[in-house]
Amino acid sequence: MTDFNLPSIFVPLVGLVFPAIAMTSLFLYVQKNKIV
């Protein structure tokens, strides 16, 4: 992972955006299917 020399903005971008999208998609999935 660290050998790719990625830009310093790419790591926090993935670290923040990916979990946000994952949580949002999961939330919408639960709301759509009424899984409570």
From Swiss-Prot:
Q: What is its main location?
A: plastid
Q: Does the keyword Ribonucleoprotein apply?
A: no
Q: Which UniProt keywords apply?
A: Chloroplast, Membrane, Photosynthesis, Photosystem I, Plastid, Thylakoid, Transmembrane, Transmembrane helix
A Gene Ontology biological process noted in the UniProt record is: photosynthesis
Pfam family of this protein, just one? PSI_8
| Cellular compartments annotated | Plastid, Chloroplast thylakoid membrane
Coiled coil ranges (UniProt) are none
Keyword Thylakoid found: yes
Question: What SUPFAM superfamilies does UniProt report for this protein, alphabetically?
Answer: Subunit VIII of photosystem I reaction centre, PsaI
For membrane topology, the record states: Single-pass membrane protein
* Listed transmembrane segments: 10-30
Cellular component per GO, a single term: photosystem I
- Which protein family is it in? Belongs to the PsaI family.
Cited function: May help in the organization of the PsaL subunit.
Supply the name of the protein. Answer: Photosystem I reaction center subunit VIII
What organism does the UniProt record list as the source? Zea mays
